Amino acid sequence: MTLALPRHTSDPASAPADRDHRPDPGRGPGPAPSRPRVLSVAGTDPTGGAGIQADLKAFCAHGAYGMAVTTALVAQNTHGVRSVHVPGPAFLRAQLDAVSDDVEVDAVKIGMVADEANARAVGEWLDDLAAARAAAGAPRPWVVLDPVMVATSGHRLLDAGAEQAVRDLAARADVVTPNLPELAVLGGLESATTWDDALRQATSYATASDAVVLLKGGHLTGRTSPDALVVPAPGPTTGRAPGAATVTTFDAERVDTPHTHGTGCSLSAALAALRPQRASWEEAAREAKEWLTGALRAGAALRVGTGRGPVDHLHRSAPVRPG
């Protein structure tokens, strides 16, 4: 279902859903690679359900060539996090440069940044990469930010400086993929308790920040699990009417399963892998949502861990055989 919210009067009646919210003369049509080259910038999960391990599986599931840069080494399993080691921004930048100096990256998915210094390092790298691509007359990569800021328990994972650094990263992203608690932190609000409130918060944030938002409704209860793509109207934010955005809602049945570990990582990674292969963010988001719903249904068959298990990223290409 598509909802057309009030739009700025100078906006055409049907703005494209894949509108890039930042001017970028460097991006343009060109020969597509045989496989999109997609980079994950995130933390680790040694059990494979979340972080860069999950991202690489999601990239593979959508026909992309996956690469990974590690922001933090996380000792975790299906029951929770035990310890985190952050190598630091200098080594993070060395990893990022090692990739971009050699490989033309088509899309970047950013997940856990761990701290303010790392977030700033990623932002500076994105700026330098965009400048280098523009100087070469080449398009910059699509950027998807999964703002990992709140634990499942509701605990804030970042201090105030790091939260602001993530907000600054959001200004460099094409799409931000918050759940309800993360959206509240981004916007400085209380977490929404209804879908209507969440849509209002997402629309307010999108129009004020000029960010495209893929809002995830998995934290709500009910028979359905909606997501929504919120695209702000074109034009400067100072002249934009409040709520001037287009909202496209993707409904799906709520899968009754405890195997939800890494769902946010996996959805944002699928979105990053799909965007270079699809005509719009709406098309990519719809396909990513459908894939994740199937991955949730299939997760129990994996039998990985004794806690909150992972989804099955390969449920389409290599389904688990019964017996």
Model-predicted segments: where are they?
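Charged C-terminal helix
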Residues: 2-8, 12, 16, 35, ...
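Conserved N-terminal subdomain of the carbohydrate kinase-like
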Residues: 3-12, 21-40, 56-152, 314-320
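Short pre-catalytic strand/loop immediately N-terminal to key active-site residues, enriched for Gly-Thr
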Residues: 41-47, 247-262
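Short, small-residue alpha-helix embedded
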Residues: 58, 184-185, 259-281
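Phosphate-handling active-site elements
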Residues: 63-67, 237-248, 274-288
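Conserved phosphate/ATP/ADP-binding segment of small-molecule kinases
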Residues: 159-247
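Short, well-structured alpha-helical segments that form the helix of a local strand-helix-strand
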Residues: 198-206, 248-250, 280-297
